[in-house]
Amino acid sequence: MPKKALEKIIDQAEQRLELLKELGINSFPREKVEPIFRKKTLALKRLREEIGDCQRCGLAKTRARIVFGEGDPSAEVVFVGEAPGEKEDLSGKPFVGPAGKLLTDIIELGMRIPRSRVYICNVVKCRPPENRDPKREEISACQRFLKKQLDIVQPKVIIALGKHSAQWLLEKEEPISQLRSKWGEYNGILVMPTYHPAYLLYNRAGKRELWMDIKKVIEYLKKGEIG
């Protein structure tokens, strides 16, 4: 992970602590909370270093950059997409193209959470040629890194964006149209499968269904129970 990106994550963690103070939440002593953020940030940094210049599958031959993931290392919500697209491949950041703009609107306008307060990653870290679906062997080559990311962040909810994300997290084979909107579980973490934002760019009818799924997550975060 680049030094500037790491510094940004640490700054976000410090801003979060200041916000808690302003809200009058002082039940988390600074000496106990800060090490948690630092520990998770360091763990993600080490994981990125472990991936290195990955050559574990054929995508290494065609990618421009590895798209590791970004966001709050202590996020309550993690979004897991399928694979980087062209703009993500060039920037090294997840969800920065048209689908990323839509995802940002879902997070910030719909859920009313700053994008910087969630964590975003993909099932595979490299762009498949011509944005094709990731192959089973490519997902297999990447899966241990996704497992470690989720184990480090330990969110309350994972929102699975698209078929490949939902099928991997839930270990199911049904299409996303059947998996979406139903709570599942991954290693004790609640999972809400829904459509990938890219799907909504050419299928506007799916926006209403996606919003129904997101509202279930919002209600759970508010009440702490599944509706």
Task: Give names to the regions the model predicted.
Residues 15, 19-227:
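A polyanion-binding, active-site-adjacent surface
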Residues 1-11:
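Short, small/acidic-rich helices and loops at N termini and domain boundaries
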